[in-house]
Regions:
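Bacterial N-terminal signal peptides
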Residues: 6-17
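SH3-family beta-barrel domains
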Residues: 19-37, 45-51, 58-99, 106-116, ...
Length: 148
């Protein structure tokens, strides 16, 4: 194999392998949606979930998406029930949302576990910028939320 061809093949393989491990988060778009144990309406219904719940997309088929939730549970959901809009789920019992990405910054609001907040961006220093459904924005530590 010619060196340029081998290099091109190597770069293609490395790029493809990297994309396999990239996390792809989606959220529930409908007011509620059903999680199933298989990609079929005839499958066992596992759970009903609410709008904005973040889910990690594991596999996508034509009409179904295999997803993982914050507890690590795997299930299937109809693709039309999902949105690409990003949300995070609060996983700590009580979380202070700060005005700036600093622990000593003023707190703009507090929120509880299992609340969904719109994801705006993640910083390199471990903070996530979020928006509450009421429109208030602030920063939380990345370790206190899931789905970022």
């Amino acid at each position: 194999m010619e060196p340029p061809v081998a290099l091109a093949l190597f770069i293609t393989l490395i790029t493809a392998a990297g994309s396999v491990y990239a996390l792809d988060y989606v959220s529930v778009a409908d007011s509620s949606a059903i999680l199933y144990d298989a990609p079929s309406l005839k499958a066992k219904k596992i759970f009903v979930v609410n709008r904005y719940l973040p889910l990690e997309q594991v596999v996508s088929l034509d009409d179904w998406v295999k997803v993982r939730d914050s507890s690590g549970s795997i299930s299937w959901i109809e693709k039309h029930a999902l949105s690409s809009k990003r949300f995070v789920e609060v996983i700590s019992p009580l979380v202070a949302v700060h005005e700036e990405a600093e622990a000593d910054a003023p707190v703009v609001f507090n929120t509880r576990q299992q609340v969904a907040l719109e994801w705006l961006e993640t910083s390199d220093d471990g903070w996530v910028k979020v928006r509450h459904p009421d429109g208030i924005t602030g920063y939380v530590k990345a370790k206190e939320v899931w789905g970022e």
